[in-house]
Each structure stands twice: as structure tokens, then as C-alpha cells.
């Protein structure tokens, strides 16, 4: 499954005194099996971009093509329904949208609307919940008797229960404790590597971006100003400063180390493990 943006612009309240162009002339592509991160300041157009992915918003100008379905501002909703079945959208604080009295009913709500096999959906959701640290009897419990972090994880899996090909998540770990953050991010990564799903992550956490993403899209004032690998992105401190994007902690540690010892390691370390490996290699060659 491939999603392609061709010269996509979106204007809120078009034709009124309050009109605002949130994104303009966006050209990009998302492929199944890859992990994307979208970064940028608040108001840079990230949320508008992802809402155009599954036609929650339709382009004011330009086209969004999902496999063989082309979406314009004129496309009727009946033609978009197959797209929405294959693209799972997890917005910020999704736990606020929980409403069923048991986890099981929450899990089958989406699959039921799309006339999917409910037993398969329940089994798939149960496996994902177990991966997130829930007990075996979680399906019979009420989500409203759980902690905020548990409710967040329940809400995320309720979208994943539809087994979408592309998963879009907007700040999924905001406010979670460290263990829950790791569980959620590792689950998303496993869905990419083990099930060939595309993950599209909006995040302000550059540590997550560095560790998990294959490609990073940088947005500024409604435009894509960069689309590259994390290693290439974090090499250019001047551009990062211009885009108001911070460095991951491990990359900052590497730059501090290189400055202190007046040296240059052979590569950019995106994880603690990679930094240790580069450090040992540097020590060996001293």
C-alpha cells in the first residue's frame, strides 16, 4: 500500500475572513513497511497533513492517492470508506474517546462498523494487549476502572484491532510513564518489522524519532522542508536550530564527547548501544 501526496494544499475556512492555509504544495510518499516520523513546531502543519492521509480532511488543491484511489476536494465519502478501513488513526489523548463498558466491546466497535470478522479482531487485539503488559482477563474488564496510562493503551489497541496496513499516531506516548512509553513504541516497531505495516508518527520526542524512524519529515510553516534519514537529519545542527528541533539526548552526548576530546566518531549514534560501540572502536584506535 502506498500513499502519495501531489501538490497538496489545505485551507481552513476557505472563502471567509478567517481562512488559513495550513499546508501548501506538499509532495511526499508513504510506503508500506516503513517507519516515518513527522516533526516540527506546533502549528507547522503536522496534524493537518496526517488528516489528509485518510481523507478526514480533503485537499483544497492537489491530490492524495491511496493505491488506486485518488482523493480530491470533490471526492465523495462513499469512495473513501475503503481507505479508512486500511489506515488506522490514533489522535492525541485517544483515551478520551473510550465509551464502551468493557475492553472487549471497545475492541470490536471499529471492526463491527467495517463488517470484519469479530473473532479474528478480538484475538488480534488480545495479543496486542498482552504485548502491552495486560493480564489475560483484560477483555472482560471496564476501561474506566483503569489508570490513565492503561486507558491510553486500550484506546490505541482499539484502533489497531482493525488490523490496518498503515498506522498513524499523534504523540502516542505523551504523558505516559517510561515503561508504558517503551511498551507502546516497541509494539509499533514490531508491527512494522513483523507485519510489514507502515507507521507514521508525529512526535516532539527526538529520542523516539532517532531510535525508531526510518525517515523523518520536517515541517515548517505548512511545508515539508526536509525528508531524510535520522542520521542525516541530526548531522546538521544549524538547520535543526533554524527549524527549532532539538537533538536526541544520545546525539547531544556524542557531540559533547567529540568537542571535549577534539575527535570525531565514525558515525552518528542514534541509540545508547550504537554510541557504546562507536566509543569502543574509538578507544581501540587511539
From Swiss-Prot:
SMART domains: AAA (SM00382). This is Energy-coupling factor transporter ATP-binding protein EcfA2. GO terms for molecular function: ATP binding; ATP hydrolysis activity; ATPase-coupled transmembrane transporter activity. It comes from the Bacteria. Its EC number is 7.-.-.-. Coiled coil: none annotated. PROSITE patterns: ABC_TRANSPORTER_1, ABC_TRANSPORTER_2, CBIO. It is found in: Cell membrane. The gene is ecfA2. ATP-binding (A) component of a common energy-coupling factor (ECF) ABC-transporter complex. Unlike classic ABC transporters this ECF transporter provides the energy necessary to transport a number of different substrates. Forms a stable energy-coupling factor (ECF) transporter complex composed of 2 membrane-embedded substrate-binding proteins (S component), 2 ATP-binding proteins (A component) and 2 transmembrane proteins (T component). It is a peripheral membrane protein.
Amino acid at each position: 500500500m502506498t500513499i502519495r501526496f501531489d501538490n497538496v494544499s489545505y485551507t481552513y475556512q476557505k472563502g471567509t475572513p478567517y481562512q488559513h492555509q495550513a499546508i501548501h504544495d506538499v509532495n511526499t510518499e508513504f510506503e508500506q513497511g516503513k517507519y516515518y516520523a513527522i516533526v516540527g513546531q506546533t502549528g507547522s502543519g503536522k496534524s493537518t497533513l496526517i488528516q489528509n492521509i485518510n481523507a478526514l480532511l480533503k485537499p483544497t488543491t492537489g491530490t492524495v492517492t491511496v493505491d488506486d484511489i485518488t482523493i480530491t476536494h470533490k471526492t465523495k465519502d462513499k469512495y473513501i470508506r475503503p481507505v479508512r478501513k486500511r489506515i488506522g488513526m490514533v489522535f492525541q489523548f485517544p483515551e478520551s474517546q473510550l465509551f464502551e463498558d468493557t475492553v472487549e466491546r471497545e475492541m470490536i466497535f471499529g471492526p463491527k462498523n467495517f463488517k470484519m470478522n469479530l473473532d479474528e479482531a478480538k484475538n488480534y487485539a488480545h495479543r496486542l494487549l498482552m504485548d502491552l503488559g495486560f493480564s489475560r482477563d483484560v477483555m472482560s474488564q471496564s476501561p474506566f476502572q483503569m489508570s490513565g496510562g492503561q486507558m491510553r493503551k486500550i484506546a490505541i489497541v482499539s484502533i489497531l484491532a482493525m488490523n490496518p496496513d498503515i498506522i498513524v499516531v499523534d504523540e502516542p506516548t505523551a504523558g505516559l510513564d517510561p515503561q508504558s512509553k517503551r511498551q507502546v513504541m516497541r509494539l509499533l516497531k514490531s508491527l512494522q518489522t513483523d507485519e510489514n505495516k507502515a507507521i507514521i508518527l508525529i512526535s516532539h520526542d527526538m529520542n523516539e524519532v532517532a531510535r525508531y524512524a526510518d525517515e523523518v519529515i520536517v515541517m515548517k510553516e505548512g511545508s515539508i522542508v526536509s525528508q531524510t534519514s535520522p542520521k542525516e537529519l541530526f548531522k546538521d545542527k544549524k538547520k535543526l536550530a533554524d527549524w527549532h528541533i532539538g537533538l536526541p539526548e544520545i546525539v547531544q552526548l556524542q557531540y559533547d564527547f567529540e568537542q571535549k576530546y577534539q575527535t570525531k566518531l565514525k558515525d552518528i549514534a542514534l541509540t545508547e548501544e550504537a554510541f557504546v560501540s562507536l566509543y569502543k572502536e574509538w578507544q581501540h584506535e587511539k
